[in-house]
């Protein structure tokens, strides 16, 4: 069972005032991305009925290439991830700040591709993964994720059902009772991931995560385009990805990430 959210919040956070009706209208009106996100989510949920966890061989056959090259990928990635200089997720994307403020533990993140928008300088740090991503454009997002010891990711839902989320653990500690430091709760079920074992799931289900160990936990995160969508949703999905790419360009995400990446070791 995951730690109760109240265990990781401060009294100030628990006393946070409720928003007024006017504030809620402003926050959820049609001029805000949340409004359109919920409409899109409804469209996908009406058309795509699937379990929370799916077979990697069916949803992401190319994951076999990752497993075949696992040792090289792990070695190259951990050289970067365990350097102590990985950018914090909330420093890259302000929208992720609430995930940091939940427990004030920085979630390390090195994006390699974001909804089809490539970060070549970051990919250059992990040559084996760079080669894989070049061969597989249907991997629309890829990132190196580092959870520090004790990190809790509060329950939330992903915004986009047009992709599968794939985890490949690279640095995970085995704990008592067959548990590990890579603990996920998805749709009420707890999973403990092991190093070198891929895991494919739908992150639009309510989920949370925690690292209960005294060591960092390093995982590769991929978003894989779903090929089981009806044709009209395929079009909507590509529009969504195109908008996400434009947004990253307008936010100067490459420049911001490269500034952070200057702290990283180079090959």
Residue ranges and their predicted role:
Residues 2-155, 231, 235-267:
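Fe(II)/2-oxoglutarate oxygenase catalytic core
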Residues 140-144, 164-169, 180-183, 198:
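Conserved active-site beta-strand-loop modules that form the wall/rim of enzyme catalytic pockets
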Residues 146-148, 159-176:
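Short, conserved beta-strand element in jelly-roll/cupin
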Residues 153-156, 201, 207-213:
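Short beta-strand His + acidic residue motifs that chelate non-heme Fe in jelly-roll/DSBH
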Residues 160-162, 183-189, 234-242:
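Short intrinsically disordered coil segments
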Residues 165-170, 200, 215-232:
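A short hydrophobic beta-strand segment most commonly corresponding to one strand
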Residues 170-195:
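A short beta-strand-loop-beta hairpin characteristic of the jelly-roll/cupin
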Residues 191-206:
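Conserved metal-binding segment of the jelly-roll/cupin
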């Amino acid at each position: 069972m995951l730690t109760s959210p109240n265990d990781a919040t401060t009294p100030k956070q628990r006393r946070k005032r409720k928003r007024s009706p006017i504030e809620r209208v402003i926050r959820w009106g049609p001029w805000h991305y949340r409004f359109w996100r919920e409409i899109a989510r409804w469209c996908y949920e009406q058309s795509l009925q699937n379990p929370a966890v799916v077979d990697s061989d069916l949803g992401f056959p190319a994951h076999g290439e990752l497993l075949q090259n696992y040792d090289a990928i792990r070695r190259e990635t951990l050289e970067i991830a365990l350097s102590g200089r990985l950018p914090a997720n909330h420093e890259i994307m302000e929208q992720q700040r609430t995930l940091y403020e939940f427990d004030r533990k920085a979630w390390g993140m090195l994006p390699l591709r974001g909804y089809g928008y490539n970060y070549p300088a970051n990919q250059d740090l992990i040559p084996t993964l760079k080669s894989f991503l070049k061969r597989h454009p249907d991997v629309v997002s890829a990132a190196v994720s580092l959870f520090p010891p004790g990190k809790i990711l509060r329950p939330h839902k992903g915004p986009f059902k047009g992709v599968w989320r794939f985890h490949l653990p690279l640095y995970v500690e085995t704990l008592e009772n067959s548990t590990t430091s890579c603990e996920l709760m998805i749709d009420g079920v707890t999973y403990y991931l092991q190093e070198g074992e891929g895991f494919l799931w739908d992150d639009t289900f309510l989920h949370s995560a925690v690292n209960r160990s005294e060591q960092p936990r390093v995982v590769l995160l991929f978003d894989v385009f779903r090929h089981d969508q009806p044709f009209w949703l395929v079009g909507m999905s590509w529009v969504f990805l195109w908008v996400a790419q434009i947004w990253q360009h307008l936010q100067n995400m490459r420049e911001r990430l490269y500034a952070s990446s200057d702290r990283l070791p180079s090959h």
